[in-house]
């Protein structure tokens, strides 16, 4: 459900109802695949699947918006603000614009995150010690248990 909401957010004002349903179904499968197969094969630590749901879902949603904006598919069309009316839909031009937007966003976020990760790593470190993680952070950081099991 969250993956569908993430994907339909960029398309909210442009996609028709059926297009939004199809986008949600497609992104659900893509995000499930990414959160299981890709995450396990790459071996990165994402316990809440934040990147698999929000990152991948947002990318698929942004690209899907370029498809679903087509009036022939029930979309709202692309507004041409220079003449003040709906412009003719050009799939190739729209997808190039969507790809540029996604690419710039991924680069900006990736570079900014890398800088911030390095700053945090230098100041306090990115991970807790292995023994503290094995013992449980509730005990090592808060000196109490969160769950009595």
Regions found by a protein language model. Give the residues of each.
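Glycine- and aromatic-enriched membrane alpha-helices
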Residues: 1-149
């Amino acid at each position: 459900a969250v993956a569908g909401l993430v994907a339909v957010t960029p398309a909210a004002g442009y996609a028709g109802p059926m297009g939004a349903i199809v986008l949600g179904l497609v992104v659900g499968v893509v995000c499930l695949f990414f959160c299981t197969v890709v995450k396990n094969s790459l071996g990165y630590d994402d316990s809440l699947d934040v990147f698999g749901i929000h990152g991948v879902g947002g990318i698929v949603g942004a690209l899907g918006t370029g498809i679903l904006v087509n009036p022939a598919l029930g979309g709202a069309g692309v507004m041409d603000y220079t003449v003040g009316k709906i412009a003719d839909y050009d799939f190739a031009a729209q997808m190039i614009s969507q790809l540029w937007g996604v690419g710039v966003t991924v680069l900006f976020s990736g570079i900014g995150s890398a800088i911030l990760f390095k700053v945090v790593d230098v100041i306090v470190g990115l991970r807790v010690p292995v023994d503290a993680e094995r013992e449980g952070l509730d005990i090592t950081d808060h000196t109490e248990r969160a769950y009595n099991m």
